[in-house]
Amino acid sequence: MEGGAAGGQRDRETLDAVRSVVFKPSVSLEEKRFPRVQGYDFNRGCDLIGLLDSISSTGFQASNLGDAIDVINQMIDWRLSHDAPTEDCSEEERNLAYRQSVTCKIFLGFTSNLVSSGIREIIRFLVQHRMVEVLVTTAGGIEEDLIKCLAPTYKGDFSLPGSYLRSKGLNRIGNLLVPNDNYCKFEDWIMPILDQMLLEQTTENVVWTPSKVIARLGKEINDESSYLYWAYKNNVSVYCPALTDGSLGDMLYCHSVRNPGLLIDIVQDIRAMNGEAVHVGLRKTGVIILGGGLPKHHICNANMFRNGADYAVYVNTAQEFDGSDSGAEPDEAISWGKIKGSAKTIKVHCDATIAFPLLVAATFARKFQERNNKLA
């Protein structure tokens, strides 16, 4: 009995020791800093805005998406009047009406595949209503917008065999299909424009830059489904330092063989692009970047010249471990001075075709609808 009692005592002591290790006392969490995890209750009905309002408390990348919604809304809502006047500011800068008129300048960057997808229409909405001021994309982000005005892109499948598609004159972008005929139509449309641009260069001393070429193409397409048309009409800057890397480059190559002489000056554009950030004055800057690569770096690098952006939202699936710029987190850009150390930043690890429509629905489009409802 004594041995059994002693063994029982040892077991209890062991259990107490185990419990002290396993059940460490918890610190209390402040719900303001650590909100409770809770998902949307569909008993409330299928309410998109209600769902998006609740998404930040869902967890994982849904919470990152919710944080991105918050950061973009801060970009949109910011006014100079939110900050106290500095001691050395002018009388005009102290004027409340003036301070309420000074807004955040929003840069939007996106890769070409997003224009191939239905994200093109969302970009068009933002540009049509002057919700963003500076766009940066790749050559495909220019040509795909124009080509879609001439012929459609189709939804296919990721698994369609390349050799089969090649034999049928079909090009695959993920699960999207672009017929070769689309590029033939693009060539027929753009060659006379390039001829005219060369003539203006020769007879009027016009100095073409990538952004001037893009604006001209937006003017010539004259199609309200095109975001480039609206960028031209609303004087929204569109930059593409890699203008030759795509079908547009193929057209420039062919044109240079048939009718040589057209020159495009990239130096003027880098000065203009950096100036978009340098000359913002008292404004803040916000960056929204879909995907990575050139558009991401070009926007962040321009903001380095003003000691960094004030807000940054990244949406991409790239990872940081390989040292790529595409996968770099906002904190890496802070080390370069491309984003301010005090900036509001978030990266959403998600396909932008999923995340961006939801982001726009909960921010730009929601505010647009609310304004229209007030005017009705």
UniProtKB/Swiss-Prot annotation:
The answer to keyword NAD applying to this record is: yes
Keyword terms of this UniProt record: Hypusine biosynthesis, NAD, Transferase
The record's GO molecular-function terms, alphabetically, read: deoxyhypusine synthase activity
EC no. given is: 2.5.1.46
Q: Which Gene3D superfamilies does the record associate with it?
A: Deoxyhypusine synthase
| Catalyzed reactions | [eIF5A protein]-L-lysine + spermidine = [eIF5A protein]-deoxyhypusine + propane-1,3-diamine
Matches recorded under Pfam families:
DS
Query: Which GO cellular component terms, listed alphabetically, does the Swiss-Prot or TrEMBL entry include?
Result: cytoplasm
Family named by the database record: Belongs to the deoxyhypusine synthase family.
Entry protein name: Deoxyhypusine synthase
Q: Give the organism the record lists.
A: Musa acuminata (Banana)
